[in-house]
Amino acid sequence: MDDDSSDGTYDLLLSASGQDKRIRTYRSPAKGIVDALNFGIGRSRTRFIARMDADDRMLASRLRKQFDYLSAHPETDLVASQVLHKSDEDDLSSSGFSHYVEWSNQILTEKDIDLAQFEESPVVHPSVMYKKDLLATYGGYRDGPFPEDYELWLRFLSKGAKFHKLNDILLEWFDSSGRATRNQSQYSQEAFQYTKALYLKSWLIEKGLDGKSICAWGAGEIATKHAKILSQNNIRIKKFYDIDPLKIGKTVDMAPVCNIEEISLRNHEFLLILSGARSIKPKIRSFLNKKKLIAGEHYLFLA
């Protein structure tokens, strides 16, 4: 798929398709990744869809390994792979994207993905292969104020689709300061939080947790902004927990702010983690585990 390129890419693709009849080249009739994806998928003649960006590189074994996995595991709807973060810009080698890749590469099993889906995107878009039937059943990529791939994953998962990730690096994912995910509003943190809120309510209902009192870890600026987005999607935070003595005892939108030491199974609450730097997350998990709280049953990371 050529999405309005102006650097000779289309001619290069035509040349390749002339040498290998398995390659078919199309130009997207409109501009933008969503239109290009849906247009290309609509012209595919296969059970499975795999894609990647023009600046990424996949290992020669990628398609075979993913095809074989889906063929051998018909209960699985989407299979991803681990990825290697690559950049020619030194200041991006230790950026948030590289930390995200490190996190994502540890999210492998169906259970891992279910618990991680609202923390960040659990699979890297150019690393996936999935059943084309998913799109016919649940709809294709959507254009809107949200990341089109993350919204699609949450939609699939909300319908019961099964995801798996191979414990194998099969893609080199190239990063640059000019990439869309760094510069377009639909990939902002606020857009991700909005997308999470759209699907979290149905997840809580599916897990039988909607009857519990929904509380939040964090009462700072980032957490309260996230809480407002949740409220707009019918998820009302009844109580906030924090460690800051200047916040404890106050209220946020009429909800009390309490000390994290008051967190207890006896409260019959479900806790949404709305704040916490990457380096702090293991400490939060350890704290909650010591209080006998179980991820997915008593708490869930949303940040």
Question: Where is each model-derived feature located?
Answer:
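Short alpha-helix within the catalytic core of nucleotide-sugar-dependent glycosyltransferases
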Residues: 10-14, 46, 59-71
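Conserved nucleotide-sugar donor-binding catalytic segment
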Residues: 42, 100, 104-184
